[in-house]
A protein has these predicted regions:
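Conserved nucleotide-sugar donor-interacting segment of glycosyltransferase catalytic cores
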Residues: 103-113
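Hydrophobic residues at beta-strand termini and immediately following loops
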Residues: 35, 128, 161
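Short, glycine-/small-residue-rich phosphate/pyrophosphate-handling segment
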Residues: 111-153
Length: 192
């Protein structure tokens, strides 16, 4: 059975991003494991935690809780990441979580030539986002995650579903969300 990891980085009740993500998940078949980033209360990595992680990695000891998120991410068949567009990217809690996922010898390794090589099982990552205004000229939150997925994690395909301009005066929010759901439906019809 397909193992789907759903990373929920939506802190608000009634999140429109979460609404779109749930719509996508309703199309998918498999076992969904949901991780709600804001409930994890992760602290940024610091000198002490980085030294601990480096030492554990050097000793090939990956039993420590610091590797929990990397192991969870690496074993998933498909990733669904939902994050609102905040301050030109995504909520800071997601960046902190990504730092935990960036664990050498679990989600990636370096080749002899010092290039990253992905170790993740997933072949596809879906990124779901909404924005009150335009994401100008590109969605930098998605671009960042896309870069990590392809360059470090070895996930060859990333897909962005986004609804923009939801808070613009006079915007038909329901129509914008409906169009985004239709894009998900069309994608799923053509690629499932």
């Amino acid at each position: 059975m397909e193992q789907i990891l759903f990373i929920n980085a939506c802190p608000r009740e009634g999140s429109r991003t979460l609404e779109l993500a749930r719509h996508l998940l309703s199309k998918m078949e498999g076992s969904v494991e949901e991780l709600t980033i804001f409930e994890e209360n992760l602290l940024p990595l610091n000198g002490k935690t980085l030294a601990l992680r480096d030492k554990m990695t050097a000793n090939q000891n990956f039993d420590h809780p610091i590797f929990k998120y990397a192991k969870q991410f690496a074993k998933a068949d498909t990733i669904v990441l939902a994050a609102p567009f905040w301050d030109l990217s995504f909520p800071s809690a997601l960046k902190i979580w990504l730092e935990y996922v960036m664990a050498k010898e679990i989600t990636f390794r370096y080749t002899k030539e010092s290039f990253p090589c992905g170790l993740c099982k997933a072949k596809k990552l879906f990124y779901i986002s909404t924005a009150g205004g335009p994401t100008l000229p590109s969605h930098m939150g998605f671009s960042y995650v896309d870069g990590l997925a392809k360059s470090y994690f070895g996930i060859p395909e990333t897909v962005l579903f986004s609804a923009e301009n939801l808070d613009v005066v006079g915007a038909d929010t329901a129509a914008i969300l409906s169009k985004a759901k239709e894009e998900i439906d069309n994608y799923w019809r053509d690629h499932a």
